[in-house]
Amino acid sequence: MSFEEVYEELKALVDEQNPSDVLQFCYDFFGEKLKAERSVFRRGDTITESFSDGDESDFLSELNDMVAGPEAIGPDAKYVPELGGLKEMNVSYPQNYNLLRRQSVSTESMNPSAFALETKRTFPPKDPEDLKRLKRSVAGNFLFKNLDEEHYNEVLNAMTEKRIGEAGVAVIVQGAVGDYFYIVEQGEFDVYKRPELNITPEEVLSSGYGNYITTISPGEYFGELALMYNAPRAASVVSKTPNNVIYALDRTSFRRIVFENAYRQRMLYESLLEEVPILSSLDKYQRQKIADALQTVVYQAGSIVIRQGDIGNQFYLIEDGEAEVVKNGKGVVVTLTKGDYFGELALIHETVRNATVQAKTRLKLATFDKPTFNRLLGNAIDLMRNQPRARMGMDNEYGDQSLHRSPPSTKA
């Protein structure tokens, strides 16, 4: 199609549907066009880049931005930055070049719904002490911070133990394209870097690793960017001691777990948000924005989430667990479970909490605050204030209009 034809088709759709988020609408439109065009030429050995709808395309782009931005690596990081994993290459490596790697990842699918349909790989659980050490090693790593406990443990269990018996073994080589992330369990590894740009691994192996940079010790890690990119390694990592033990995680396993987790979570958020009456005036794109802004928080049994008499500033959806609504002088008036929500009126009014909500069991919540809500929706908030539910008094059966049980259909 010519540019004029595409433009006319897009303009007609915009005029017909009058979307509130024009940029999102255009993004989805071109994503569908691109998908249709690629489907004509797709071959079995090419990268799977199709999506079932524009929402997944948008989600995938946002997820890549979230976890792969250069700003994610802070100045206080204790690890060696920008060391990726290793990819099989058609070169002659020396005998002590350790090929702890699989084949090229160029055919891996990055479609989150495709991950959800795959047969889930199971990994044997690690010894509790090993798992504890791995958790300590990756604590604070930006790649792991958004995983819930289940998927966090799944990632750690997916790591495989590798033993390197000799000193002088190159685990990764500068210039090679890699796809593994490593945690050092035992032994030490030296990091070297050549100053040349675009140097090849063959040149590194034939003329030396370059300048010494630092030494990686047990409990530290390297190669984390290989979990997101198949970009060339920025340095070489060579075993310094004999009898080394490292744990390796490949990019496909990691991304499958992370993308599947985030995709399922977003779909859950969107379905729950559809059941919130005060958000009923929002269109699909506005609810998607809210779903993307939700953050997961966990409260242990007995913890207070909101307290009666406080000014409300947060909205909550229950992902898992149970919460009790407690009124002064009345005790527990209702128990909220998965799919229920509370605090929504705090988003559009300066409301005082008329009840306390406390965790009855371990409670997993999705939440966002009023400033985020205002930033995302702007003028739409005025429309929400005029809805009958928003104008009602705070005298429902819980004594607080912002404590609400969702319809039975949302229960799991």
Curated annotation (Swiss-Prot):
Record bears the keyword Electron transport: no
InterPro entries: cAMP-dep_PK_reg_su-like (IPR050503), cAMP_dep_PK_reg_su (IPR012198), cAMP_dep_PK_reg_su_I/II_a/b (IPR003117), cNMP-bd_CS (IPR018488), cNMP-bd_dom (IPR000595), cNMP-bd_dom_sf (IPR018490), RmlC-like_jellyroll (IPR014710)
Segments for region (Disordered): 392-412
Coiled coil spans: none
GO CC annotation terms, alphabetical: cAMP-dependent protein kinase complex; cytoplasm; cytosol; nucleus
Disulfide bond residue pairs: none
CDD domains: CAP_ED
Motif extent (Pseudophosphorylation motif): 101-105
Any one GO BP annotation for this protein: negative regulation of adenylate cyclase-activating glucose-activated G protein-coupled receptor signaling pathway
Keyword field: cAMP, cAMP-binding, Nucleotide-binding, Phosphoprotein, Repeat
SMART domains: cNMP, RIIa
Molecular-function GO term, any one: cAMP-dependent protein kinase inhibitor activity
Classification via PROSITE patterns: CNMP_BINDING_1, CNMP_BINDING_2, CNMP_BINDING_3
Residues recorded as bearing Phosphoserine in the entry: S104
Annotated stretches, region: Dimerization and phosphorylation: 1-142
Sites where the protein binds 3',5'-cyclic AMP 1: 143-277
Residues holding 3',5'-cyclic AMP 2: 278-412
Quaternary organization: Tetramer, composed of 2 regulatory (R) and 2 catalytic (C) subunits. In the presence of cAMP it dissociates into 2 active monomeric C subunits and an R dimer.
Family: Belongs to the cAMP-dependent kinase regulatory chain family.
Name this protein carries in UniProt: cAMP-dependent protein kinase regulatory subunit
